[in-house]
A protein has these predicted regions:
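Residue(s) in the substrate-gating loop at a strand-loop-helix junction
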Residues: 140
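Substrate-binding pocket helix/loop in short-chain dehydrogenase/reductase
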Residues: 96-97, 101-109
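Active-site helix of classical SDR
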Residues: 120, 156
Length: 272
């Protein structure tokens, strides 16, 4: 896909994967509408990129249905078209399902599942008017292989993956594509701030960079894939566990021990 003069909306666009994707889209010549709850970081990334392309910002909570509708009206008003929607905003509160606050559970469902469903639905007529376009949902390997201490998060990402696959079929032949990128742990700093609550199983997999996930987002815009897992080997492992669930009790302890070693090493490095 040629991004020159295309309009790209990125939720969660102020930092991490969202900011990395914004930089790559800007380098490719796309116009950007960046969305986040925090104005300070949003303004900072917008100012950084304005020498390269046109950038607008919209401060909002993606769980606000009225704001979601206003987002597309703003994009249409500012740029005259919408070509790509990246549903990247996310929320993750780790802990045992019995102890995680009900408000946090609800917010994970609202932000990680309900919001991208609503935003995708709202985007469709605008993408159709532009002659076609792309929706990229940022999922997680936890949506393919549920992770302890992240039960609700895993459920929200699994639901997002299922929605993506179903809508992909509904949109077949329409000129509008939807896909999901499913990364494992990402080196954005957030994972280290809550490391004691992160499952050992999570750290058994290679940690991706925000740039690697962002590049996968751009790649999915221009190919026929419905899903891209990062790292690829982790995606293969989750597929095997899904196809052969009887394997899980045998291999899981190995990966948990491996992850525990990695976690201890990371914590030691953080103390230095």
């Amino acid at each position: 896909m040629i991004f020159k003069d295309k309009t790209v909306i990125i939720t969660g666009g102020s930092e991490g994967v969202g900011a990395a994707a914004a930089r790559m889209f800007a380098d490719a010549g796309a116009n950007l509408l960046l969305v986040a709850r925090g104005k300070k970081n949003l303004d900072a990334i917008a100012e950084e990129l304005r020498d390269k392309t046109r950038v607008e910002v919209f401060v909002m909570d993606v769980s606000d249905a009225t704001a979601c509708a206003d987002l597309f009206k703003k994009a249409q008003f500012e740029f005259g078209r919408i070509d790509v929607l990246v549903n990247n905003a996310g929320y993750h509160k780790r802990g045992l399902a019995e102890t995680v606050d009900a408000v946090d559970m609800g917010r994970m469902i609202d932000v990680n599942l309900k919001a991208p469903i609503m935003l995708s639905r709202l985007a469709l007529p605008y993408l159709r008017d532009a002659g076609g376009g792309v929706i990229i949902n940022v999922g997680s390997l936890a949506g393919r292989a549920p992770v302890p201490n992240s039960a609700t998060y895993s459920a929200s990402k699994s639901g997002l993956r299922a929605f993506t696959y179903a809508l992909y079929e509904e949109l077949r032949g329409s000129g509008i594509k939807i896909a999901v990128v499913s990364p494992g742990p990402i080196d954005t700093g957030f994972i280290m701030s809550d490391i004691d609550q992160v499952s050992d199983l999570t750290f058994s997999q290679p940690i991706s960079t925000a740039d690697e996930v962002a590049q996968a987002i751009l790649d999915l815009c221009g190919n026929d894939q419905r899903e891209k897992s990062l790292p690829a080997i982790s995606g293969l492992l989750t597929t095997l566990m899904y196809l052969f669930p009887w394997l899980s009790p045998h291999v899981r302890p190995f990966f948990e021990r491996k992850g525990a070693r990695v976690k201890r090493k990371l914590k030691a490095q953080a103390r230095q």
